[in-house]
UniProtKB/Swiss-Prot annotation:
Designated name of the protein: Cyclin-U2-1
One GO BP: cell division
Originating organism: Arabidopsis thaliana (Mouse-ear cress)
Keywords of this entry: Cell cycle, Cell division, Cyclin
UniProt cross-references to InterPro entries, sorted A to Z: Cyclin-like_sf, Cyclin_P/U, Cyclin_PHO80-like
GO molecular function, one term: protein kinase binding
Gene name in the database record: CYCU2-1
Tissue spec. comment: Expressed in roots, stems and flowers. Expressed in the shoot apex, leaf primordia and young leaves.
Length: 222
């Protein structure tokens, strides 16, 4: 995993001052961490498949041809063209984890991982950030037809039961998990995007819990 070891002081500095528009060539460290996690998951699922056969019954994200691009390169491409902040990738990771837990017949594999990533990152971007690209743009970045990505988004939302809410404590716990994943390697860290956490907290205050899922649906479908 190509990450740069940083001190706590540098981490705090990056956390509060990291600018994607001013420094467009700097890839967030969370991308390396997330790609490493997914690569390990792919390897584990491949071993399970060889031992027990099959990759599960949920095949909604399967593609006919496996993209000739590593997970790291694919995530870097998404960042390069969307400038999605670190918090988007953390929330996408939350969604992927929830999806796998809620759909026991699904396993991440080479045939579905790229489509799963572009779909969850797009949805997470809509949930986290104020300004977003259209689905057609995300489709172009991800190498899909717009209609295909629209269908994947709807399938994902229904399979998730529209449970997209990520509160501050959940967000922080996943950040800590990602940090623990790389701490063994010598003090690696990821950006947690404090602004995102504060925005999520403010939304919790203004949103009516009784209408929460309807509100999320309106955000996603815009």
């Amino acid at each position: 995993m190509d990450s740069l070891a940083i001190s706590p002081r540098k981490l705090r500095s990056d956390l509060y001052s990291y600018s994607y528009q001013d420094d467009s060539n700097t890839v967030p460290l969370v991308i390396s961490v997330l790609s490493s996690l997914i690569e390990r998951t792919l390897a584990r699922n491949e071993r399970i498949s060889r031992s027990y056969g099959g990759f599960g019954k949920t095949r909604v994200f399967d593609c006919r041809e496996i993209p000739d691009m590593t997970i790291q390169s694919y995530l870097e491409r998404i960042f390069r063209y969307t400038k999605a902040g670190p918090s988007v990738y953390v929330v996408a990771y939350v969604y992927i984890d929830r999806f796998c837990q809620n759909n026991q017949g699904f396993r991440i594999s080479l045939t579905n991982v790229h489509r799963l990533l572009i779909t969850t990152i797009m949805i997470a971007s809509k949930y986290v950030e104020d300004m977003n690209y259209k689905n057609s743009y995300f489709a172009k970045v991800g190498g899909l037809e717009t209609e295909d990505l629209n269908n994947l988004e709807l399938e994902f939302l229904f399979l998730m039961g529209f449970k997209l809410h990520v509160n501050v404590s959940v967000f922080e716990s996943y950040c800590c998990h990602l940090e623990r994943e790389v701490s063994i390697g010598g003090g690696y860290q990821i950006e947690k995007a404090l602004r995102c956490a504060e925005e999520i907290k403010s939304r919790q205050i203004v949103q009516d819990p009784k209408h929460h899922h309807h509100h999320q649906f309106s955000r996603i479908m815009l």
